Swiss-Prot record:
It holds the Pfam family Pantoate_transf. GO terms for molecular function: 3-methyl-2-oxobutanoate hydroxymethyltransferase activity; magnesium ion binding. SUPFAM superfamilies: Phosphoenolpyruvate/pyruvate domain. The keyword Acyltransferase does not apply. It is found in: Cytoplasm. This is 3-methyl-2-oxobutanoate hydroxymethyltransferase. Its main location: cytoplasm. The active site is at 183 (proton acceptor). Coiled coil: none annotated.
Length: 261
């Protein structure tokens, strides 16, 4: 069954949780799709996990399009969403429509994601949805604002901050977002937002009560050197890969591989 936006929204109503992971190329996308991931996010986190940048800000729209095309070639079932990178949508709703239109025209992705729920961004989401472009919202910790935060601290800890994030989520739903990512907020706030919205919430460090969960695949598989505090590693692939490559190098260097036969 091919996953669609209406299907995700039906799953919220039925209580079936949504599994989301990130991918940045054909290989990872094909593995995630075969494993049953519901939504594959071509996240701008690829700037860090695939391209070696210190944060997500250097990534360009052309680079996102390149990686999204590669991801889509590996997907048969999952819904694919492309992150709009920093600087490709904040200037105006018109800029956002141009950038998002390129995503839908130049890749097979079905939707875009952007960060923020402040009034200007809500207006942008309204324009995108009116243009027929599905939007995945994102509130709480928004990594493209890393320099404003001075890092990646939890958001929504004060009453005022929690009320603001809740208001942003409601405004994004009213603007037409089909789902919203809640990142690095207290679990009780994640529950409140999930109960208030009729669209799915996808949590990352937002507690167990969201309608779905997302992790960066490098974190979920134990490839990252440093894990976020809310991530869970389901494997230790970093160590497995290091050991395998070291064994290969040793066998080549000592003339054990390929054998004499």
């Amino acid at each position: 069954m091919v996953v669609t936006i209406p299907q995700l929204q039906q799953w919220k109503r039925s209580g079936r949780a949504i599994a989301v992971l990130t991918a940045w190329d054909w290989l990872w996308a094909s593995l995630l799709d075969q494993a049953g991931v519901d939504l594959i996010l071509v996240g701008d986190s690829l700037a860090m996990v695939a391209l070696g940048h210190k944060n997500t800000l250097p990534l360009s729209l052309d680079e996102m399009l390149h990686h999204t095309r590669a991801v889509c070639r590996g997907v048969q079932r999952a819904l694919v969403v492309c992150d709009l990178p920093f600087g490709s949508y904040q200037e105006s709703p018109q800029q956002a429509v141009r950038s998002a239109s390129r995503v839908l025209k130049e890749t097979p992705a079905q939707a875009v994601k952007l960060e923020g729920g402040y009034p200007a961004m809500v207006e942008t989401v309204t324009h995108l949805v009116r243009a027929g472009i599905p939007v995945l919202g994102h509130v709480g910790l928004t990594p493209q604002s890393v320099h404003q935060y001075g890092g990646y601290p939890q958001q929504g800890k004060s009453v005022e901050a929690a009320e603001r994030i809740l208001s942003e989520a409601i405004a994004l739903e009213q603007a037409g977002a089909f789902a919203i990512i809640l990142e690095h907020i207290p679990a009780d706030l994640g529950l409140t937002i999930t109960q208030k919205l009729s669209i799915p919430t996808i949590g990352i460090g937002a507690g167990p009560h969201c309608d779905g969960q997302v992790l960066v695949t490098a974190d979920a598989l134990g490839l990252s050197e440093r894990q976020p505090p809310f991530a869970k590693a389901y494997a230790n692939l970093r160590e497995t890969i290091l050991q395998a490559v070291q064994e290969y190098c040793n066998e080549v260097q000592t003339h054990q591989f390929p054998g004499s036969g």
